[in-house]
């Protein structure tokens, strides 16, 4: 079996885990003999630029390049550039569709990790206290800004009411605060825009007859 490098990989990362995302994307690409043009989110460019300075002392020139900017300009240029052989994106579904369209024009390879929320299925014989403990930790990790956040829960009829009550109590006990407050469990969201977006989901849910908000429901200042 012969394995050849793909060539130039354009990697586009989100803002929720900027340093880890960069490491995850660079490692396999470089190990496979490729070069990488990396675009961090315009909201979190500093970690990528710092790591680029460190890599400049280790890797040959041109193996890793970092270009900061917005998706509409820098991102669009990368995915449409004829010199790019592969696109790697971690982002939302709408952006993924645009990338597939762009990649099809020049037959680029693609690697897409698109957004979603992890479902949790709880059967009637489950240990409710253990489930609640896990949900309290992993539903709100990184302020819930995680595509694997356990935010969708499907529970059996027999334990449904108990699970809702216990999970409501657990969620109500979470400490919210500033990012530099060592006592907090959840810090602020990445931006005002994201805060407004999350608040809109709650407001939309509140208008549905079958939805009951059991705790919270109001944005914090």
Residue ranges: model-predicted function:
Residues 1-130:
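Rossmann-like NAD(P) dinucleotide-binding subdomain of oxidoreductase/dehydrogenase enzymes
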Residues 59, 86, 92-221:
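ALDH superfamily catalytic-core signature
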């Amino acid at each position: 079996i012969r394995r050849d490098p793909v060539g130039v990989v354009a990697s586009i990362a989100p803002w929720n885990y900027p340093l880890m995302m960069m490491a995850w994307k660079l490692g396999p690409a470089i190990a496979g003999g490729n070069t990488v043009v990396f675009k961090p989110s315009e909201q979190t460019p500093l970690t990528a630029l710092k790591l680029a300075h460190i890599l400049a002392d280790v890797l040959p020139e041109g193996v890793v390049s970092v270009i900061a900017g917005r998706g509409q300009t820098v991102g669009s240029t990368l995915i449409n550039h004829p010199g790019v052989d592969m696109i790697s994106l971690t982002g939302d579904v709408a952006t993924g569709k645009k990338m597939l369209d762009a990649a099809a024009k020049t037959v680029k390879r693609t690697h897409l990790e698109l957004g979603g929320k992890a479902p949790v299925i709880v059967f009637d014989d489950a240990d409710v206290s253990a489930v609640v403990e896990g949900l309290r930790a992993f539903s709100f990790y990184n302020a819930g800004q995680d595509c694997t956040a356990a935010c969708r829960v499907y529970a059996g009829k027999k334990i449904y009411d108990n699970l809702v009550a216990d999970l409501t109590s657990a969620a109500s006990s979470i400490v919210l605060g500033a990012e530099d407050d060592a006592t907090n469990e959840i810090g602020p969201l990445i931006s005002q825009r994201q805060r407004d977006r999350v608040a809109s989901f709650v407001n939309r849910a509140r208008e549905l007859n079958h939805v009951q908000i059991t705790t919270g429901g109001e944005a914090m200042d």
